Amino acid sequence: MVLIKEFRVVLPCSVQEYQVGQLYSVAEASKNETGGGEGIEVLKNEPYENDGEKGQYTHKIYHLKSKVPAFVRMIAPEGSLVFHEKAWNAYPYCRTIVTNEYMKDDFFIKIETWHKPDLGTLENVHGLDPNTWKTVEIVHIDIADRSQVEPADYKADEDPALFHSVKTKRGPLGPNWKKELANTPDCPRMCAYKLVTIKFKWWGLQSKVENFIQKQEKRIFTNLHRQLFCWIDKWIDLTMEDIRRMEDETQKELETMRKKGSVRGTSAADA
């Protein structure tokens, strides 16, 4: 058995704008999660071509310990909380696989994302068979809804309900911003359809861990997209060449940060 959810994140930007904004935000957020021996190590970031599909391939290692719940830390052997993330970004489609060498075939997280120029109304964009699609829970993430944010994660300067973009004149996003966006044809819009499939095969812990991971994925998607919108004035003028240069610099920074200082960023909200 696997647990599958589809998260839909609507944003007031175009699919083209989002490509730069998402890469910028991931690089910045990585720095906030790295330090004290934990965090993100970038092994590869290079173009790929496979069966006619072209894009950017990344291989990252996540060194975790304090970022997993206590009930996992208690039973996990030393050195086992290291996760490999491989991503194939053939934008506007992206596929990410997370694995763990200790658990081998008993664990994976698969995130498949389609970025579409709509308001999150398309059904089964990932083309699942009807029986599988019936089991998928759809979760709508509203980046302007503070009630969807963990209290410990809230930052006023990363709140789309308060933020106004000087460069694009977008925001702040009120309670009915999606309806207003639907009635404003000249403002860009898009939706990230993120299909998350989780397998964790460990007797007695399976459903608890699978639900914990899905909860954490929602938390990550919510926080990242709130940041992405509120950082729009920092990335809206950047090109993909700028982003690749920034990623190279970030890779070096992360390596230095991970080896010193204290643990930073999100800790596990124990489920």
Curated annotation (Swiss-Prot):
This is Phosphatidylinositol transfer protein beta isoform. Pfam families: IP_trans. The gene is Pitpnb. Constitutive phosphorylation of Ser-262 has no effect on phospholipid transfer activity but is required for Golgi targeting. It comes from the Eukaryota. GO terms for biological process: in utero embryonic development; retrograde vesicle-mediated transport, Golgi to endoplasmic reticulum. The modification Phosphoserine is found at S262. Keywords: Acetylation, Endoplasmic reticulum, Golgi apparatus, Lipid transport, Lipid-binding, Membrane, Phosphoprotein, Transport. The modification N6-acetyllysine is found at K215. One of its GO terms (molecular function) is phosphatidylcholine transfer activity. Changing S262A: Abolishes phosphorylation by PKC and impairs Golgi targeting; no effect on phospholipid transfer activity. It catalyses: a 1,2-diacyl-sn-glycero-3-phosphocholine(in) = a 1,2-diacyl-sn-glycero-3-phosphocholine(out); a 1,2-diacyl-sn-glycero-3-phospho-(1D-myo-inositol)(in) = a 1,2-diacyl-sn-glycero-3-phospho-(1D-myo-inositol)(out); an N-(acyl)-sphingosylphosphocholine(in) = an N-(acyl)-sphingosylphosphocholine(out). Catalyzes the transfer of phosphatidylinositol, phosphatidylcholine and sphingomyelin between membranes. Required for COPI-mediated retrograde transport from the Golgi to the endoplasmic reticulum; phosphatidylinositol and phosphatidylcholine transfer activity is essential for this function. InterPro entries: PI_transfer, PI_transfer_N, START-like_dom_sf. Belongs to the PtdIns transfer protein family. PI transfer class I subfamily. It comes from Mus musculus. GO terms for cellular component: endoplasmic reticulum membrane; Golgi apparatus; Golgi membrane. It is found in: Golgi apparatus; Golgi apparatus membrane; Endoplasmic reticulum membrane.
